[in-house]
Amino acid sequence: MFGDHLSGIYEKAFDPAISWEERLLRARELGFNYVEISIDEKDERIARLYDSGAALSELRAACANTGMQIKSMCLSAHRRFPFGSADAAVRARARDIMDRAIDFSCELGIRVIQLAGYDVYYEPSTPESVRAFREGMLWAAGRAERSQVMLAMEIMDTPFMNSITKHMGYEAMIRSPWYKVYPDLGNLSAWGENDPAQELARGMGSIVAVHLKDTIAVTDSCEGKFKCVPFGSGCVDFTARFAELERLGYKGPYMIEMWYADGTSDTAEIASAAKWLQERFAEAEKLVGGSSNA
């Protein structure tokens, strides 16, 4: 799909009514190598981490029956239960969710947990919330290191963690081989202060995977749009970003992040997005001398 890179597709790109086995089967038939599972702030998704075993058994069976893997987790539950909360009970819940997400990943063979880079989301950010977030990240990295599960910070839709440069400060502080970065090309491109080419170069050696998503840029007159932007209608120059990553020698996976819309065909929408992105990747290959086969 994207040269020699593995390709992933987000769980939420599919109709939520279908089973995991059907979701994985559709992903395989569309040409993907794996699916990224979502543990967001909804109770039913957080509950997966607290299940007595039924959820894991279903997922293991679905993977075995389809020959597909769930290789990564998008862990955005910390938007609701942030490490930087002023409430000690919320901070404790953040750690419990992280602890269970790591155990869940070990049980299922998930390699990478993508973290949400918010000190807080529904509370005001303060020096105390930033300090608590740092403490939480130090703890989380140690917990992940013990279990050999990679934690990778997403570049976000708020100023707190909206660049690879900001992440690298945390990486330097934490100093763990199990705490890296998982940039979202859409979020990275939406902030005018970012030079995406320089940001990607700065992160090389730390980038474990890349989210493919389009966005509407943040400007003085527009707050930006970070979700459900059709590929090709936003601000991301995918050809340039692919070319930069290829020149830098990036070998990790590309993961398409998109969301199912009611009344649509998930397979048709995903196939259309994948085709469009493959065309941009082919353009990038020409720019760098055709070093891979699309």
Summary of predicted features, one role per range:
Residues 7-10, 43-46, 85-88, 124-126, ...:
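A short, structure-level motif marking secondary-structure boundaries and short turns
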Residues 36, 72, 114, 152, ...:
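Conserved beta-strand positions in the central sheet of alpha/beta enzyme cores
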Residues 1-8, 13-33, 160-183, 189-294:
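Histidine-acidic metal/acid-base catalytic patches
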Residues 1-107, 138, 176, 205, ...:
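N-terminal pre-domain/capping segments
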Residues 43-47, 79-85, 121-126, 189-191, ...:
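A short acidic, helix-capping loop that chelates divalent metal ions and anchors anionic groups
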Residues 21-25, 62-66, 81-180, 268:
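Active-site acidic/histidine proton-transfer and metal-coordination neighborhood
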Residues 33-34, 69, 111, 150, ...:
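Residue-level detector of anion-binding/catalytic polar loops
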Residues 40, 78, 118, 215, ...:
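Flexible loop residues that form catalytic
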